[in-house]
């Protein structure tokens, strides 16, 4: 899980979602998981 000021999809399988008001990227590749913070 990476915490970044700006989250972007890295590959075509990355999905940008919102959980509890936070923007997150979820993906099949665990290295692509990101959280805005």
UniProtKB/Swiss-Prot annotation:
It holds the Pfam family Ribosomal_L36. The keyword Ribosomal protein applies. PROSITE patterns: RIBOSOMAL_L36 (PS00828). GO terms for molecular function: structural constituent of ribosome. Signal peptide: none annotated. The keyword Ribosomal protein applies. GO terms for cellular component: cytoplasm; ribonucleoprotein complex; ribosome. InterPro entries: Ribosomal_bL36, Ribosomal_bL36_sp. GO terms for biological process: translation. Keywords: Ribonucleoprotein, Ribosomal protein. NCBIfam families: rpmJ_bact. PANTHER family: 50S RIBOSOMAL PROTEIN L36, CHLOROPLASTIC, LARGE RIBOSOMAL SUBUNIT PROTEIN BL36C. Belongs to the bacterial ribosomal protein bL36 family. This is Large ribosomal subunit protein bL36. It comes from Clostridioides difficile (strain 630). The lineage of its organism: Bacteria, Bacillati, Bacillota, Clostridia, Peptostreptococcales. The gene is rpmJ.
